[in-house]
């Protein structure tokens, strides 16, 4: 429906899990961020919008998606993004995140957003069952809420607070800098991964 008509319904909260991986240059309206923009345009000024989308949609990997991100910031405000457990949609292969926006208020250049790594959410995959809750899940959820609502501070490996650009990848992994000195095993593994990558690139020509 037309966003202006939907806005007349005076919705103050919007939530969405849009279709995944349908967008293309031929069908830019089917990109996840296009659905997000339409939802934001359909809400009243100051409304809160929460969407669960693939992490890849936060990167602006195509010109069309980059343009959508730029346009969203011209008219709406990004509050933050929470990176989720890779097995949230177990068996699907999509790594999701939750993005939170405020509708109808252009994103200020000095706005500080939160980017949270919630991949370790207290849920694990059980054989033949799927994703199950562990004993730590409730405490981890409470910790997430406490950090999001500024009740407590968190280490940057969990939450990075920063200003953003439309050209950024709106993900914790983009803004986080790990200044911890790696262990010898971590160093060896990283070098091994890099050499494997280089070898595969050479073999592919």
What are these regions (language model features)?
Residues 1-2:
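Conserved SAM-binding strand-loop segment of SAM-dependent methyltransferases
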Residues 5-8, 12-205:
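A conserved structural/catalytic subdomain of Rossmann-like adenosyl-cofactor enzymes
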